[in-house]
Amino acid sequence: MSSLLLFNDKSRALQADIVAVQSQVVYGSVGNSIAVPAIKQNGLNVFAVPTVLLSNTPHYDTFYGGAIPDEWFSGYLRAFQERDALRQLRAVTTGYMGTASQIKILAEWLTALRKDHPDLLIMVDPVIGDIDSGIYVKPDLPEAYRQYLLPLAQGITPNIFELEILTGKNCRDLDSAIAAAKSLLSDTLKWVVITSASGNEENQEMQVVVVSADSVNVISHSRVKTDLKGTGDLFCAQLISGLLKGKALNDAVHRAGLRVLEVMRYTQQHESDELILPPLAEA
C-alpha cells in the first residue's frame, strides 16, 4: 500500500464548508444525490457521506442496495481527520440514516468534532416517516434520534408525523404542532422548522412553521400536486446553504421553500419523475 502513496502533504487537502450525511442513489434525485449539486450551485463546498447506497428509491419495480456497514461508515468519518480536510468546516447536515448504530457513530464523531469546531452548525432532518406511509425506517431509529442526535443539533426539520414521533404529542393542528416543537427546544437546540404543517387546502397552500424560543413564523407556499421524491432533501440543502451565506433563519426558510417549488415546476415541465435542478438565479 505504501508504494501507492502519492498525497501526503496535508496543507494541500481539499476543504469543505459542509459535511452532508444521508442516503445516496445511483439513479435518481434523493438524499445526497440532490443535496450535493444543490449545495454546490450555491457556491459552497460539500463532502457527501452515504448512509445507504441504493440503485434508486423503492418506488420503482426493481430495487438494489442497502445500508453502509458500520465499519465503512465510521471509516468515512475518520478519514476526514486523517486527510486534515475539515479546517474550514462550518456545518454538518443529516438526512436518511440507515441504522441506529450509524446514528450513535455519527453522534460520537460530532461530539469529538465540536472540540475543534465549537461554532459548528449541526442541522438534523430526522427522517422517520410521514402521515401517509407511517414509519418507513427501522423501528429503533426514532429513539436513536432522541438519544444521540437531537441533543447535538442546533436546528431540526421534521415533518408533522416526525414531530409527533419525536415528542409523543398530537400535532395535527397548528397550535399543538408549535407547542410540540417548543417542547424540544433547549440550550443547544435553538429552532425547529416544521416542514409540512397544516395549510389551506382550499387555496392549495402548505405551511412551513419556524419555531424558536422567542418567535413563531408561519410561511405559506403554493401546494404542487406531485409524487416527486427528494423535495425534503432539497429543502434542507437550500436551507443550510442560505444560512451559511448569511441569511437570517426565516429568510433562509422562505427562500428554500421557493427554490423547491421552482425545481418541482421545472421538473414537471420536463416530464421527469426525478427532480431536475434548473440554474440558480442570483438572490
Curated annotation (Swiss-Prot):
Family (UniProt): Belongs to the pyridoxine kinase family. PdxK subfamily.
HAMAP family, per the entry: PdxK (MF_01638)
Matches recorded under SUPFAM superfamilies: Ribokinase-like
InterPro entries linked: PdxK, PM/HMP-P_kinase-1, PyrdxlKinase, Ribokinase-like
PANTHER family, per the entry: PYRIDOXAL KINASE, PYRIDOXINE_PYRIDOXAL_PYRIDOXAMINE KINASE
Pathway noted in the entry: Cofactor metabolism; pyridoxal 5'-phosphate salvage; pyridoxal 5'-phosphate from pyridoxal: step 1/1; Cofactor metabolism; pyridoxal 5'-phosphate salvage; pyridoxine 5'-phosphate from pyridoxine: step 1/1; Cofactor metabolism; pyridoxal 5'-phosphate salvage; pyridoxamine 5'-phosphate from pyridoxamine: step 1/1
Protein's name in the database: Pyridoxine/pyridoxal/pyridoxamine kinase
Amino-acid positions noted as binding Mg(2+) in the UniProt annotation, renumbered to this chain: Y136, E162
CDD domains given in the database record: pyridoxal_pyridoxamine_kinase
Disulfide cysteine pairs (residue numbers): none
Gene3D superfamilies xrefs: 3.40.1190.20
Enzyme superclass (EC): transferase
Swiss-Prot/TrEMBL catalytic activity: pyridoxal + ATP = pyridoxal 5'-phosphate + ADP + H(+); pyridoxine + ATP = pyridoxine 5'-phosphate + ADP + H(+); pyridoxamine + ATP = pyridoxamine 5'-phosphate + ADP + H(+)
Binding site for ATP: D125, T157, E162, T195, H221, S222, R223, V224, T231
Cofactor: Mg(2+)
GO MF, any single term: ATP binding
Gene (name only): pdxK
Protein's UniProt keywords contain Protease: no
Gene Ontology CC entries for this record: cytosol
Native source organism of the sequence: Shigella flexneri
Positions that bind substrate: S23, H59, D233
Assembly behavior: Homodimer.
EC numbers, comma separated: 2.7.1.35
Function: B6-vitamer kinase involved in the salvage pathway of pyridoxal 5'-phosphate (PLP). Catalyzes the phosphorylation of pyridoxine (PN), pyridoxal (PL), and pyridoxamine (PM), forming their respective 5'-phosphorylated esters, i.e. PNP, PLP and PMP.
